[in-house]
Amino acid sequence: MREPTNRQGSPGPGEPRPPAQGRPRFPTWILWVALLALALWNVYTFFWPSSGARLNIPYSAFIQQVEGENVSSVTIRGQRVSGTFTEEVRVAGDQVLSPGDPVPPGTSPNEIRTGTQFQTTIPENSQTELVPLLQSHGVTVKIDQAGGSVWPSLLATIVPLFLFIGLMVYLGRSMSRGQQNVFSFGRSKARVYDAERPRVTFADVAGEEEAKAELSEVVDFLRNPMKYHAIGARLPRGILLVGPPGTGKTLLARAVAGEAGVPFFSVSASEFVEMFVGVGASRVRDLFERAKASAPSIMFVDELDAVGRQRFAGLGGGNDEREQTLNQLLVEMDGFEPHQDVIVIAATNRPDVLDPALLRPGRFDRQVTVGLPDRRGREAILRIHTRGIPVADDLDLEELAAATPGFSGADLANLVNEAALMAARKNKKIVERIDFDEALDKIVLGTERAMIMSEHDKRVVAYHEAGHAVAAHFSPGTDPLRKVSIVPRGQSLGVTIQAPEEDRFNYSRAYLLARLTVMMGGRAAEKLVFNEMTTGAQNDLKEATLLARRMVGLWGMSDEVGPVYLGMGEQHVFLGREIMQDRDVAEATLERADEAVQRLLREAMERAEQLLRKYRDKLDALAEALIAEETIGQEKITEILGAPPVPSAAPAAAADSV
């Protein structure tokens, strides 16, 4: 299946601009190093204009040293004169001290400098008089004509100034970009899939024919909007895809965009909400503006319940930021201009928690149920996912679809991928049915565990699973057995798998009672054979109790309570909602319901014990076979137990594990 290439949308409306790639960026550290070096150089030249060994002396002291024959050479650079004394001198402030001269009072030792290198500044137009004086005293004179140029000092002043200005401009632009980044929190993060990209079509979607038929009307509207506008028809502004996880809600939305050939804006509802208050509402506005600018277009919001959850539900009040986002979404959806040609498609697997204002006509006024595929749908999905995989010629996808009841499209895709991994691990060139069987066991039961068990524990587990199998085989109306194993997988020490012959969507009381009997078969076998009870029945008791509570409190299948709905056995996602809801049931009724649950479980235990005592020889034979072979398939089970007394019905699959 081809997926459309996704790219980030641009901040503004219209055609998105892909981000620049490979754009050279100036290394900012070079600018900082250069600026620091120039600053240090200017500071150094300001405080130490020449080498640190040169003594700054007044011009008058310089003339005294020349007349005293203590100057050997000088270099004249404009008005700056530097040179070398014949003998070392001391300088205290502005005075040059000859050897033997006293130090002026009040002069600290740190203020006295000594050396032979000096520099001074001569008055203007004094060079013509100075040179003959120097020559008359035998001083070597060097004239540096470049020293009179103003360019070095000019450059030393201008270059740092321009560098400083450049740095300020750069920092200003960086701050501007930073402000844009701050304000970009309000930009939508929607990904855009346009018509020029590889697209998903309805041919890539299988098992949801009813949903595809519903959405084909949307496709026709986007292709031929004038046909609907001409007669005054208006397409639903919002379409809500409802279904369990993994059933293909997002894939259906992409298929609608691919069939219609219009821009497709995809965003997760959780991306609307950020740490800053008001960002979510701003992103909603931005997303709708972009979608309107690209009309006709499709806007897809995944996991709508992240922001569309009912306001002020549960304890502790609501979330102000999320509710602001929801309010903005409500306003935008109800504020479309007529015939805007923008369709909002959203997906959720929790429609029961959505705010009622979202579901009213004018917003999400059409709901499309995307349920689990049936047997034919699973076969079609398997054909799509095996198109690019070399499978064995004798692989029966119809039979494989029958062995995977309750699997969603995502589950089937995972099954095909796991089977391919199994085959690759064995260095096979094609994927065979045994690879699919191993992948199915791994997904449903978990990975095999290398576990060393004592002979007694192994025997207990074998009889436990054999008890489930015998109860399932000889209880009328149960699902046929597919496999029994005492190989530890996942959290279980063993497993008994029952596979249905057909999909069933309605369950009778007789079938549910038989299921309770099968669940109690493991504990009954432990009591019958070992006269002991183990912790291996924990999961069986949990599932049996939950099923019995539903039979009594949800489906009205007990004589003590009668046909009444008590809400027992329901799963409450929000703790606050469960605590705050009213209890319209009397305590006496709840007590009778508990007694009815206990009676159902006791009777199931008695039926299981009767079956195992009646077929004790079958129980022993199956347990010994499990101890010897660890895993027994359907043919071996039939060989040991024989044919079931009554043809089995076709309910949904089940697995009982220790």
UniProtKB/Swiss-Prot annotation:
Q: Look up keyword ATP-binding and say if it applies.
A: yes
Membrane side Extracellular: which residues? 50-149
Q: What's the top EC group for this one? A: hydrolase
Protein's GO biological process: protein catabolic process; proteolysis
- Per the UniProt record, one Pfam family is AAA_lid_3
Listed InterPro entries: AAA+_ATPase, AAA_lid_3, ATPase_AAA_core, ATPase_AAA_CS, FtsH, P-loop_NTPase, Pept_M41_FtsH_extracell, Peptidase_M41
Q: What keywords appear on the UniProt entry?
A: ATP-binding, Cell membrane, Hydrolase, Membrane, Metal-binding, Metalloprotease, Nucleotide-binding, Protease, Transmembrane, Transmembrane helix, Zinc
Q: Where are the transmembrane segments?
A: 29-49, 150-170
Cytoplasmic-side stretches of the chain, per the record, are 1-28, 171-658
Membrane topology label: Multi-pass membrane protein
Q: Which cofactor does it need?
A: Zn(2+)
Q: Which PROSITE patterns match?
A: AAA
| Family of this protein | In the central section; belongs to the AAA ATPase family.
Per UniProt, subunit arrangement is: Homohexamer.
- Spell out the protein name for this chain: ATP-dependent zinc metalloprotease FtsH 4
